[in-house]
């Protein structure tokens, strides 16, 4: 699909409808302001306004929970403890200030806005042990994957906002096809470590990922037939989507940049009232399954002012696969 998409899209997944809105700009109005102001005008079908989350004024800073910038010390517990604290208090905002922050998986909870200040860079660790294997859904089918860097399940009134950047460390997860790289890129990648298949066409981040690829290509072998202990040895094969929002309501992603995702970047599944505004996604053009946004089985979704430069599809509309669709 298109590598870069910068349009106003208005989606009702209840009827799987999609329409681009028109905008009448005034001399003093920017394109983004025009889109936001006029998004509900001239829609060719009946569509309720997408509800956005609202948060109490209460605010905490991850530094207050022991987070240290610099990219050397894990801030996983500090960030998640800040989120839990705000959630238990009834809601508010967790601020990630400017700086380099190294972390494992972040779990969003109801009534919490995770807000990144300008010049905040959140880098997710490439240590596979930090990402437990869970039951989830990917590419339209239920199955096991590693926990996503950012996730929410059965949450309501949640957001990720601000001007910060999230780096998913996807280069440590994704396989790479030789045909998608220059000779210089390929040679540098192979020299960096990892494993190459017997045909010399695909690079894998470790021996476990290659083993899983060979195993899954055999007739009669299914993911369900492989034990959790076996998957632990092949964990890199179970690369997660970067942002997994499941069965949640009133979700806002705004202003932030996501890059270098292990698989799909943003995957809302079975959500209602989702707004994605002014979000940027950057993945290398050779990234395997590097979709920017996959909206699956959702209802009332508004996407505006976004820039997606992805290694695969920019925006996909999905509703499961086969019997699960």
State what each model feature region is.
Residues 2-17, 21-95, 100-113, 117-254, ...:
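Extracellular "leader-to-stem" segments immediately downstream of a signal peptide or signal-anchor
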